[in-house]
Amino acid sequence: MDATNSSVLCPCGSALGYARCCQPWHLGQPASAPEALMRSRYSAFVMKNAEYLLATWHADTRPSKLDLEDSPEWTSLQVISASEEGLAGKVHFRAFYRAGEGWGYLEEHSDFIKEGGRWYYLSGDTSEGQLKPGRNDACPCGSGRKYKVCCLRK
């Protein structure tokens, strides 16, 4: 992704340009809500920005390092629900990916906490599954086109 090109859409699926969406958070501005932090973290996974992921992970649950070299090719994000109550937040999402010739998804119910005016990812309950899109199904890459005229050809 060419982050210097202001017309590039943000990987989080907001339909905004990256420069107006997740980039300010990646550059250190605090996320405004749990959903905003989750979207920015998804974008960081797409961009393999381990530094940002670690910085936005709560100290109580943060791993000492994060290796993203073998990460799948993340293709789209679907936010199912998001809520905020005081200093706690929850986001339920599904992230789709391509791994080799197949497709899969990661679904998570994430918990967030606000400390010192910043939201942090705390933990999540995850499940994964395989996708077998039909030719006339929506493409899991998030393009909005049918699978047969999009990624099936690749």
What are these regions (language model features)?
Residues 107-133, 149:
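Short beta-strand edge/turn micro-motifs at domain boundaries
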Residues 3-8, 25, 29-30, 131-132:
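Glycine/tyrosine- and acidic-biased, solvent-exposed loop/turn segments at the edges of beta-strands
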Residues 3-16, 135-144:
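Short Cys/His-rich zinc-binding micro-motifs
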Residues 55, 59, 90-92, 103, ...:
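Long C-terminal interaction/binding lobes of large macromolecular proteins
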Residues 24-65:
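Core segments of small alpha/beta cavity-forming domains
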Residues 20-22, 148-151:
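Cysteine-centered loop/knuckle micro-motif
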Residues 154:
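Sequence context surrounding c-type heme c attachment/ligation sites in exported
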Residues 70-105:
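Surface-exposed, charged secondary-structure patches
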